Amino acid sequence: MLEYYNDADKESVYENYVKIVSKPKNINDVSITQMITEVLKQFNSKRFLYNLCCSKELTFLKNILNNEIDEDDFLDYMFEIKTLSKKFIFDQDNFCIFSEQIDNVKYAIKKFNKYGAKSDEYIYPISILRIVGFLPLEMFKSANYENTKYERKLTFEEYLSNPLLKFYTTIYEENDEKYICYANYYELIPEIEEERKNYINFKSLTSNKYLIEEMFYYGFPIYNKKVKKMYEFINQNIPYIIDYVDEARVLNDYSTVERFLKDDKARKIINEGLEYSPSCALYGLSPVDYLDLKDSE
């Protein structure tokens, strides 16, 4: 694993390192070798990998161990490969589990076969944050922790320390109030807040099962035909712009991605898909749903 990461960009390694270890060091005080050492030390806790992965990832790892899939199946497992690589579990260049993680994976699969994926229970709150961007921590606590089975078994701090939840979220403070956000959107929060000044908060966010699952796995509600067409078009033709398309969705700002598009067909497919994708700037509504609510006022 050290050889794999020694040539990697330090900032990219650090971005994932802070999501894994319980007490990360400042980027200027830690080398890549030290980061990998600390990551592996974190994985020494036997249940850590099991709690860090959702059912899709554990099923993928199980299939890898059983030699049931190989690199020819790459496009069918983009979510699993991307996330497990970021979690220091899967070597996507050689399409294999890192040797240092084999025993941890075997233990996790044994738990998965017996109990299922316990961390799947955290998919809902993670998806809501991906849809709306951020929430006051007290609101998040009220919606996901208070008066639930978690409150009877765990302190709120213990609930927040779940490895899967911690991997996808960041807690920060603004104007003496704590907030929790989808981690990848932390740098976009000032822009989200600025964009929201142009829109009404209808407080009518709906979240069906398909929306929740697909926002977690794909970042887009691909059960919608136009969104699915957009998602498949991007992955098959211009996969390198997927993060820019996601940013366009978050900010409801098509210019974020349009500058990369010279083809009218691509522009049309992507814009139509974004029209049906929930935007953080629109308080979690899609542009189409937002306009429908505005027109019905």
Where in this protein do the model-derived segments appear?
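N-terminal membrane-targeting/insertion segments
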Residues: 121-138, 149-155
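Long, charge-rich C-terminal accessory regions
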Residues: 154-255
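Short capping segments at the starts of secondary-structure elements
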Residues: 55-59, 65-72, 128-139, 222, ...
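Accessory beta->alpha helical hairpin/"wing" motif in late/C-terminal subdomains of nucleic-acid enzymes
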Residues: 26-42, 86-116, 170-193
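DNA-recognition alpha helix
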Residues: 14-18, 139-147
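Charge-enriched amphipathic alpha-helical scaffolds
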Residues: 76-91, 145-175, 249-290
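Basic helix-extension-helix modules of the SAP/HeH family
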Residues: 1-99
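Short, amphipathic alpha-helical interaction segments positioned at domain boundaries
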Residues: 47-49, 100-131, 184-208
